[in-house]
Swiss-Prot record:
GO process terms (BP): L-histidine biosynthetic process
Location of the active site: 11, 130
Catalytic activity: 5-[(5-phospho-1-deoxy-D-ribulos-1-ylimino)methylamino]-1-(5-phospho-beta-D-ribosyl)imidazole-4-carboxamide + L-glutamine = D-erythro-1-(imidazol-4-yl)glycerol 3-phosphate + 5-amino-1-(5-phospho-beta-D-ribosyl)imidazole-4-carboxamide + L-glutamate + H(+)
InterPro entries per UniProt: Aldolase_TIM, His_biosynth, HisF, IGPS_HisA/HisF, RibuloseP-bd_barrel
The protein's name in its UniProt record: Imidazole glycerol phosphate synthase subunit HisF
Organism for this UniProt entry: Saccharolobus solfataricus (strain ATCC 35092 / DSM 1617 / JCM 11322 / P2)
Signal peptide range: none
Involved pathway(s): Amino-acid biosynthesis; L-histidine biosynthesis; L-histidine from 5-phospho-alpha-D-ribose 1-diphosphate: step 5/9
Protein family (similarity comment): Belongs to the HisA/HisF family.
First-level EC class: lyase
Length: 251
């Protein structure tokens, strides 16, 4: 069995970490540098830093905050938000990111995925896919969950793999912040459709949810935010629990 990864997510707005429900009603949770450092100490395998309003505010990512966050980490850092061109990808990598997450721009011009993978390697390119169920179908939404692209999520996942993405960050908007568990059906369908790693995101509320998304949905990694920010689950305890349940994790 491959080693499963636990990823702590920092949703950043105006330089502060925030968290909401279904991408709405954001509350302040702390500053990214100290939280990133804390989660590494607790045993997180990676940190994802998402500048959640960069795209809808039509501005560049917060490169100074990214630089400060990267400077305290020795685990991989993925950065997303406001990434529109291969130059933005380059800037994020130069600021200290190990991987760059592309979301809205990938839908608007899929060549950014292809060009970035060719220039920086697939291992540096993550495509974030935010999904809502609409009339029984899984549909891709962009612009922080505000815009219905009418793209089928499974077809889009296959397409980004073809374009050279090295990983998919899959978020269920319906489950985001609800703490009701990951969308296992959606995650499994995407995992079965591609040959690149899939990070499950949206809905983690208790340790069992991580076990389910690894054992039933076969996700390669599980991302969470609110339950870590609020101290409901400590990453160290989560990894001990998963290890006892037969899931291979880095201790």
């Amino acid at each position: 069995m491959t080693t499963k990864r636990i990823i702590a997510c920092l949703d950043v707005k105006d330089g502060n970490v925030v968290k909401g429900v279904n991408f709405l009603n954001l509350q302040l949770k702390g500053d990214p540098v100290s939280l990133a450092s804390l989660y590494e100490e607790e045993g997180a395998d990676e940190i994802v830093f998402l500048d959640i309003t960069a795209t809808i505010e039509a501005r560049k990512a917060l490169y100074n905050v990214i630089k400060d966050t990267a400077s305290v980490l020795s685990i991989p850092l993925t950065v997303g938000g406001g990434i529109r061109t291969p130059d933005d990808v380059s800037m994020a990598l130069r600021s200290g990111a190990d991987k760059v997450s592309i979301n809205t721009a990938a839908v608007e011009s899929s060549q950014i995925v292809k060009k970035s993978a060719e220039e920086f390697g697939s291992q540096a390119v993550v495509v974030a896919i935010d999904v809502k169920k609409v009339s029984g179908n899984w549909i891709v939404f962009t612009k922080s969950g505000t815009y219905n692209t009418r793209l089928d999520a499974i077809k889009w996942a296959k397409k980004v793999e073809e374009l050279g993405a090295g990983e998919i960050l899959l978020t269920s908007i319906d489950r985001d912040g609800t703490r009701l568990g990951y969308d296992l059906e959606l995650t499994r369908k995407i995992v079965d459709s591609v040959n690149i790693p899939v990070i499950a995101s949206g809905g983690a509320g208790k340790m069992e949810h991580f076990y389910e998304v690894f054992s039933l949905a076969k996700a390669d990694a599980a991302l969470a935010a609110g339950i870590f920010h609020d101290g409901i689950i400590k990453i160290k305890d989560l990894k001990s629990y998963l290890s006892q349940k037969g899931i291979e994790v880095r201790m």
